[in-house]
Amino acid sequence: MINAEKYGVHVTATNREFLNIFKTLNETRSTKGVAYAKAVVKNSEVIKSHLDPIEEKAKPSEAFMLLSMEAQKYIQAEDGEGLKKFEEEHSDVIEERKKQMDEVNSMLDQTSTLELKVINEAHLPEDLSAEQLETLIKIVN
């Protein structure tokens, strides 16, 4: 859903879609062209500030980080039995991380509306792939 405004458009999408738009804008950040670059910078700022709380929520706990590093020893040694035992011993921390990631995924699936700068089709980079365009199409006119 797009409503034209003075600044740009109100774009309604899931937070996951906004994350993909943000990633695509960053992938194309070095593209030449002032109009496109301006839209990239402005839209990236708006989307990043909107997604920051989700990113913060996704950060693993210190306990999980330490376990993850220790688990790498079992993985590198290809010690499946040892890894399984290790995971069982620390199931509380692992379950907490799974719960945390479920909450993050739930947040990413929520719908939001952001005011973004429209990118005129004439200002799109020549080397933009179909996949990248598909991601950005909500902000292209």
Task: Briefly describe each language-model feature range.
Residues I2-N141:
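A composition-driven surface/loop motif
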